[in-house]
């Protein structure tokens, strides 16, 4: 048994303008090469664009997008008797949100467009409406889990 204590769970801090943890999680995932101020600029510009496009609160659009993209179940590779099986596992809320943010940013980076703020705002609006690349990724993950349901007992 380990003599070290268990690590404390870190709670995500909230960002300075919207006072929201999801925005801060998004900022920390969009961050590249330690340029946090640039990450904040991109996020806030994207929020302004969402405000202009939808004429609603951008935080509610963000919450709706993340709720729509968050997966309930995913597959994990598990080696059993020389062969690798994709075993479906349930995902907790924190891990699900982290995956959703990662997928949203990945989908927005792939989008053609002028700048990251524009691409991110478009992806968030699409995800809130129930379309877009990130939603497709979630559905694909759920399909994979459903197809490999027979291996659920390997969990």
UniProtKB/Swiss-Prot annotation:
Gene3D superfamilies: Ribosomal protein S7 domain. InterPro entries: Ribosomal_uS7 (IPR000235), Ribosomal_uS7_bac/org-type (IPR005717), Ribosomal_uS7_CS (IPR020606), Ribosomal_uS7_dom (IPR023798), Ribosomal_uS7_dom_sf (IPR036823). Its main location: plastid. PROSITE patterns: RIBOSOMAL_S7. It is found in: Plastid, Chloroplast. GO terms for biological process: translation. Transmembrane segments: none annotated. GO terms for molecular function: rRNA binding; structural constituent of ribosome. Keywords: Chloroplast, Plastid, Ribonucleoprotein, Ribosomal protein, RNA-binding, rRNA-binding. Pfam families: Ribosomal_S7. GO terms for cellular component: chloroplast; small ribosomal subunit. One of the primary rRNA binding proteins, it binds directly to 16S rRNA where it nucleates assembly of the head domain of the 30S subunit. Part of the 30S ribosomal subunit. HAMAP family: Ribosomal_uS7_B (MF_00480_B). Belongs to the universal ribosomal protein uS7 family. PANTHER family: RIBOSOMAL PROTEIN S7. This is Small ribosomal subunit protein uS7cz/uS7cy. The gene is rps7-A.
